[in-house]
């Protein structure tokens, strides 16, 4: 199983609609024409953008539980403050949930891995997502962690992560076949049990 090239990614995006909102080249400027974090097709991956809505984790809500419980979604969701804008300031040692601008449709013989951009990593910002499973479709929810001791600025509609695609033989049971709980998610999706 080898990582797929730009030519393969472009073909799948254009012919199979694997990436809705696909940009066929690297874009290195923001919406104002100023230098920005690159997004679009790269040599062996696709650099995706995040939307302008950020769910900022906060531990200052007095009505929320004193801990995060992934099995008690109602209590956990009270820890988030929703912010809309062209950027987001992530507090030190905290994180933000957001999602990709692009909508992905993974074929049943393709799995994706989402990795952070080196520019952010060099500022103490790290991304966490799970594998993008064969047969899954939706906007990718991304967790952006600020591991530095200072607030960090993250930009909407600019490059946030790179998706690598791996093709293999068809799986026996895809994410869609299993009826995965995040199938078809739109926008930022909090944890589900």
Can you annotate each of these PLM segments?
Residues 1-193:
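Non-catalytic terminal segments and appended small domains
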């Amino acid at each position: 199983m080898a990582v797929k090239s730009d030519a393969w990614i472009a073909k799948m995006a254009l012919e199979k609609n694997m990436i809705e909102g696909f940009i066929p080249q690297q874009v290195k400027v923001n919406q104002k024409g100023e230098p920005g974090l690159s997004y679009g097709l790269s040599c062996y991956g696709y650099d995706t953008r995040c939307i302008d809505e950020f769910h900022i984790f906060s531990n200052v809500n007095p009505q929320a539980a004193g801990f995060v419980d992934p099995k008690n979604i109602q209590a956990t969701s009270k820890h988030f403050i929703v912010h809309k804008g062209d950027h987001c300031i992530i507090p030190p040692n905290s994180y933000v949930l957001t999602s990709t601008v692009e909508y992905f449709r993974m074929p049943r013989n393709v799995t994706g891995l989402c990795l952070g951009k080196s520019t952010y990593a060099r500022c103490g910002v790290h991304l966490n997502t799970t594998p993008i499973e064969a047969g899954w479709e939706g906007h990718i929810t991304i967790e952006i962690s600020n591991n530095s001791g200072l607030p960090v600025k993250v930009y909407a509609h600019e490059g946030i992560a790179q998706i690598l695609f791996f093709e293999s033989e068809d799986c026996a049971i895809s994410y869609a076949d299993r009826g995965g709980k995040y199938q078809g998610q739109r926008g930022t999706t909090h944890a589900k049990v």
